[in-house]
Amino acid sequence: MPKYRSATTTHGRNMAGARALWRATGMTDADFGKPIIAVVNSFTQFVPGHVHLRDLGKLVAEQIEAAGGVAKEFNTIAVDDGIAMGHGGMLYSLPSRELIADSVEYMVNAHCADAMVCISNCDKITPGMLMASLRLNIPVIFVSGGPMEAGKTKLSDKIIKLDLVDAMIQGADPKVSDEQSNQVERSACPTCGSCSGMFTANSMNCLTEALGLSQPGNGSLLATHADRKELFLNAGKRIVELTKRYYEQDDASALPRNIASKAAFENAMTLDIAMGGSTNTVLHLLAAAQEAEIDFTMSDIDKLSRKVPQLCKVAPSTQKYHMEDVHRAGGVLGILGELDRAGLLNRDVKNVLGLTLPQTLEQYDVMVTQDDAVKKMFRAGPAGIRTTQAFSQDCRWDTLDDDRAEGCIRSLEHAYSKDGGLAVLYGNFAENGCIVKTAGVDDSILKFTGPAKVYESQDEAVDAILGGKVVEGDVVVIRYEGPKGGPGMQEMLYPTTFLKSMGLGKACALITDGRFSGGTSGLSIGHVSPEAASGGNIAIIEDGDMIAIDIPNRGIQLQLSDAEIAARREAQEARGDKAWTPKDRERQVSFALRAYASLATSADKGAVRDKSKLGG
């Protein structure tokens, strides 16, 4: 029978000092036999996805206390990728994931907490907390802040839906008037919550649901809706049950590694492919799997991508649907239900509610459930009122979207495409793979060949695009922006956005060892591995080299002979200590980022730290 970890600091005469300090936090004698549960919050006023979380930790804590636990809250950092985008701040985004994971480990292990409730929401916060949870392997429940309502405005006498990416595109489009650009900017992000499309934050919150670590509805229920409060209340109650099951009944099924098994990871990736999620999710799932000591690799993702169809299409791949529409169609479990009927899921998995996948679908899949309360929950909709308050409205759609032929979520028979929304490509400068969000690629450019225009920084590429130096048919190559080379693996949302602004969104390709925002669409290929700074062949590409992209056949090729590639690699090595570094780039890199770069692996490993360098 496992002992409560917290007993280390609450029992025994030699722990008198620790107990004295616990008493100073408000604990009493009656608390010293109870489980201590960490409420891991991520409130910040910097990030709209987290601005409403201040009081939600207290909400969870009250339920923990009422259920017989002791709640202790702490906060992590949270970087807003949208605000950090397009300048040096983006160098810090991905490294913040490791800091978040480490800070959770530090706090939980230093104070011997028994379990956790993780209150996350945005891009690197959910992955960081997920990595920590699987590293620590103590009972955990995730409950996120929820998606933002889609923006809406009237243009040309028509009400249209908007999101952050629309504001960026129109802001850079010289054909758009200042008045219209300002109107879109003011309308794009109307409420608190994670940005309203299937960007990285919402993708990851959907995946925690598929992994079984969060409750039904977590990925899609709006931040502003009153129904979301129940997820927080239930999380506080349920975590105490899970904790007691493990420590008092020796039931290891309550542990995250037994819930988020390899089968669950495969289900999560299957969901991601089917819903056309952010390419960043690949990076984060690979990293989380390593923390869980699960053998889940790019090869597994490649196999899944070849058999899973696209059953859901959401912004940025279309402006017709946002997360509020996904929720109306049944949310994550609506998509999982269709995948299950198609025979594409592992059914022998459980979630934090203790339900198997078939049991969960029977209760929560809107296409089969008989539970009116569940149907009501999935009719929760937007209010269209600007606010930063959680649970501030109770609007509902009159009906569910259960049209699986032409609705937001489709059945296998009516799939958006037989190929899923993500694909892994391999070739002679991506030997370990690269990722493309096929959901956002126009059918006309699934096969594309063109001359390379090579840039050694995102800034240089942006200047070239806006300066008219990139033309129709070009393949823009941005290198030395990987985890090690950046360092920090910047998101390339600005280059892809500006290609659209210049009318080149369907006329050019962009390839990088960096990564893309969940808001990216178009022929944007990232995570090229090995990266340039690790000796990858992306470093030897020159202007004018022809590059062939073949998404249907999962190929990407630099059209050079093996002999020429070998000669260029030899020339690169001849640069000595300057080999595999950018030639002309000037970039100030802080000590903190240099420390990150010294251990960073390429994207095919999830950009995690190389344990072998630490003797681990």
Curated annotation (Swiss-Prot):
Record-listed [2Fe-2S] cluster binding positions: C122, C195
Active-site residues, as the UniProt record annotates them: S517
Gene3D superfamilies: IlvD/EDD C-terminal domain-like (3.50.30.80)
UniProt catalytic activity: (2R)-2,3-dihydroxy-3-methylbutanoate = 3-methyl-2-oxobutanoate + H2O; (2R,3R)-2,3-dihydroxy-3-methylpentanoate = (S)-3-methyl-2-oxopentanoate + H2O
Cofactor: how and how many bound: Binds 1 [2Fe-2S] cluster per subunit. This cluster acts as a Lewis acid cofactor.
GO molecular function: 2 iron, 2 sulfur cluster binding; dihydroxy-acid dehydratase activity; magnesium ion binding
Pathway: Amino-acid biosynthesis; L-isoleucine biosynthesis; L-isoleucine from 2-oxobutanoate: step 3/4; Amino-acid biosynthesis; L-valine biosynthesis; L-valine from pyruvate: step 3/4
Superkingdom field: Bacteria
UniProt-listed PROSITE patterns: ILVD_EDD_1, ILVD_EDD_2
Documented EC number(s): 4.2.1.9
Cofactors that this protein relies on: [2Fe-2S] cluster; Mg(2+)
GO biological process: isoleucine biosynthetic process; L-valine biosynthetic process
Keywords: 2Fe-2S, Amino-acid biosynthesis, Branched-chain amino acid biosynthesis, Iron, Iron-sulfur, Lyase, Magnesium, Metal-binding
Subunit organization: Homodimer.
Family: Belongs to the IlvD/Edd family.
HAMAP family hit by this protein: IlvD (MF_00012)
Protein name: Dihydroxy-acid dehydratase
Origin species: Klebsiella pneumoniae (strain 342)
Gene assigned in the entry: ilvD
